[in-house]
Amino acid sequence: MKAKSGLCMVLISVALFFGTFSPAKADTLLFPIIVTNYPNVTTIVSVVNRGGSGYFTSSHLRYVYSYKYASSSYSSGCFGASVVMPTWAPDLVSFDASGTLNGGGSLFNDSDIYGGSFAVLPSGAVRSYLLVTNSDSSGNRVDVGYTMALSGEAIVMDILYGAAWGYRAVNDSNREDYSFSSSGISNTLHVGDTRRFTFFPPSEWTTRFFVTPVGSNMNTADVNSTIRLLGFQGSSSGSITGRGSTTYNFNVSQYVNCTAAVNLSDLMDSTAWSGIYYSGGWGWFNNAAGSPAMVYKLEYVVNNATYGGTNNNAFLLSSSDGP
């Protein structure tokens, strides 16, 4: 179950419900990772509307957030918030999802009048994903006749320490509604897929995985995946390998519901963690069960003079590359 709230310009309502929206289709973007913590951490979102078939466009776009607090468990469900804003074609709008910059209004001297803030998430450390779809002024989806009318990019920024990473929004090539499938997205990690990764010493660097499972009705439903570290050479028991070829075995998995940032330490036992703590190592990230997922590996260091202060790096673990 997902708690949903809607904000149409200045009207806010909060409700708990199951259900779906109108069956009419609309091109929909997925921003799988939105990280906010006003006023220190923000995600700047940019949305391009090139129009639909024959450059027909909707009058508005609806921005639907599914979120939970960073302190929530990986398995907890999400709440929801949404806002409806006018749009034009062609058009570009950029905004700060945390509300730190320009109060969440449009950025970079945008001459268009949107009439309010795009930032409808609560304060505090929040993890979320964002759906953007064509709609009417009430937020009902409309069909523009083209599955690639919208595109977008996002940049996650640590304003306090000065670091950033970014990604492109996802657009299912086969459909226009709030559902996403592996057949329409080339860069998910399918169930059963495994990707090799490395990590720096946890004594200095933090490694975590931002995981957003994808599936049907992502505007109302919490989709889930079970993730783990697969054993060396495909062993059924999990493992991690440190420098010097020492391999540590364990059986640990995490159930991710809606979205979560999973710490590397939560994917192994304490013996393995102690063994690789000062050296780092490598392993196999596995989507073991549930739904396909968008998975980004993030590695960062904060205020460490050895590495020039604060630095981070993130990339997508994708089924379209390998191993």
Q: What are the residue ranges of the model-derived segments?
A:
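Bacterial N-terminal signal peptides
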Residues: 9-19
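Gly/Pro-rich, tryptophan- and cysteine-flecked surface segments typical
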Residues: 22-323
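Bacterial N-terminal signal peptides that target proteins for export
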Residues: 1-10
